[in-house]
Amino acid sequence: MVITGNELWSKVQQALQHNLSKPTFETWIRPAICSGFRDGELTLIAPNSFASNWLRKNYVQTIEAAAAKIYGQSVRVSVQAQEEDSAERVLPPMTSASIPSPLPTAETTTASVAPSSGPRRILPGLNLRYVFNRFVVGPNSRMAHAAALAVAEAPGREFNPLFICGGVGLGKTHLMQAIGHYRLEINPEAKVAYVSTETFTNDLIQAIRKDGMQAFRDRYRATDLILVDDIQFIEGKEYTQEEFFHTFNALHEAGRQIVIASDRPPSQIPKLQERLISRFSMGLIADIQSPDLETRMAILQKKAEQERMMLPRDLIQYIAGRFTSNIRELEGALTRAVAFASITGLPMTVESVAPMLDPNGQGVDVTPQQVIDKVSEVFDVTPQDMRSSSRRRAVSHARQVGMYLMRQGTDLSLPRIGETFGGKDHTTVMYAIEQVEKRLSSDPQLASQVRRVRDLLQIDSRRRR
């Protein structure tokens, strides 16, 4: 049979699309491209080393079987990683195929999924909308999404624990709960627990008060998969950290999967025991960044299709351009716009919706990224320096000015500003603003630099309350 490598790979993809789940196909199979077919060997290129390793370990035999059936004789498959400088050519564009159909409207699961042999039934409390099919993958989240799916497919193997970090409203909880849904779909009898750190702490306190520590330990250590959200709130809680450390060890040694989410990496969580930092870092740390414009537009388009709404492209682009911080704000803006148009009877256009989203022109003047970029330019540091924990004098001063101008030029709260600068505490932001205000009156050079950044950003001199 005479066939080119691209033709063979295309036919293999078509065959596998019917045999694999949609998240699996979209994450691992669709992005790979064929780079050659010679002497019975099909060479594939994956977007990165992470994807190539996963394909080799989990799907090469499946691909070889499908290829052999199509080609009529055995086919060897080799997988390589795309070079970093050309990786963008491999990453697939966002298409309508990535947009899933709506799920049931119920918000959370209500039935127990733990087997009756367990010490107690564990209610996952998962939001039915938080599944892989409803997660829009962009450059900001591709690694975290792939890691989450890998863990869902093979828990307790490669990435244990999986530590997902990123700012507020970027999709950490969505990915965590998607892992839980995936496992329960494969095995409805799996013991899955999704808990916030606050819930874990409260359960621990109640166990201590009621002399129920053994029941507490049995409950958490009997899980097959534990999903722990907002682990940053464990900071400073010594006894909670102690108990979580032992729970972590018990689960990890038993080969149970642990998934943790935080707004910052383990090393940046204040007052976190070194041994927990070590445990949290021993698997894979997957970071989620703020989505770019194209991803934000894809998110809005997906939400509109799920709600069966037809929105003009310029309105989607307008909303995506105005709300850049996180996905919750983005979807919230769309919800407000739809409600406004429905109540007033006005058409869904930029002209009719813009005044509601930005009353009196007093909305967000600049984006956080613009502030960081311009301050970095004027103060001769890098944006990475601004978000780092570096205490070098030049970096520290630039970071303080960035926080000061972000408070003036955006509507972000102090905690949100802190998150933008690598997860700094809101008290750090307050201190930075106070220091800059004090120095402006006595440091002409600083005043000149601040004026220059303000001019570049066109920020007025008012102080937001």
Curated annotation (Swiss-Prot):
List the PROSITE patterns: DNAA
Q: Which domain of life is it from?
A: Bacteria
InterPro entries named in the record? AAA+_ATPase, Chromosome_initiator_DnaA, Chromosome_initiator_DnaA-like, Chromosome_initiator_DnaA_CS, DnaA_C, DnaA_dom, DnaA_N_dom, DnaA_N_sf
Q: Does the keyword Membrane apply?
A: no
Q: What positions does the entry give for ATP binding? A: G169, G171, K172, T173
Ranges where the record places region Domain II: 73-124
**Gene Ontology cellular-component annotations:** cytoplasm; plasma membrane
Where is it located? Cytoplasm
Q: Does the keyword Protein biosynthesis apply?
A: no
User: Which BP terms does GO give this entry?
Assistant: DNA replication initiation; regulation of DNA replication
Q: Where is this region: Domain III, AAA+ region?
A: 125-341
**Annotated stretches, region: Domain IV, binds dsDNA:** 342-465
Q: Name one GO molecular function term.
A: ATP binding
Q: Which CDD domains match?
A: AAA (cd00009), Bac_DnaA_C (cd06571)
Q: A Pfam family in this protein?
A: Bac_DnaA_C
Q: Which region ranges are annotated with the description Disordered?
A: 86-116
Q: What keywords sit in the KW lines? A: ATP-binding, Cytoplasm, DNA replication, DNA-binding, Lipid-binding, Nucleotide-binding
| Region feature (Domain I, interacts with DnaA modulators) | 1-73
List the biased-composition ranges (Polar residues): 106-115
Concerning its family, UniProt says:
Belongs to the DnaA family.
Q: What is known of its domains?
A: Domain I is involved in oligomerization and binding regulators, domain II is flexibile and of varying length in different bacteria, domain III forms the AAA+ region, while domain IV binds dsDNA.
Role, per record: Plays an essential role in the initiation and regulation of chromosomal replication. ATP-DnaA binds to the origin of replication (oriC) to initiate formation of the DNA replication initiation complex once per cell cycle. Binds the DnaA box (a 9 base pair repeat at the origin) and separates the double-stranded (ds)DNA. Forms a right-handed helical filament on oriC DNA; dsDNA binds to the exterior of the filament while single-stranded (ss)DNA is stabiized in the filament's interior.
Q: HAMAP family, alphabetically?
A: DnaA_bact
Q: What does the subunit comment say? A: Oligomerizes as a right-handed, spiral filament on DNA at oriC.
User: PANTHER family, from UniProt?
Assistant: CHROMOSOMAL REPLICATION INITIATOR PROTEIN DNAA
Name of the protein: Chromosomal replication initiator protein DnaA
What is the source species? Prochlorococcus marinus (strain MIT 9313)
Lineage start = Bacteria, Bacillati, Cyanobacteriota, Cyanophyceae, Synechococcales
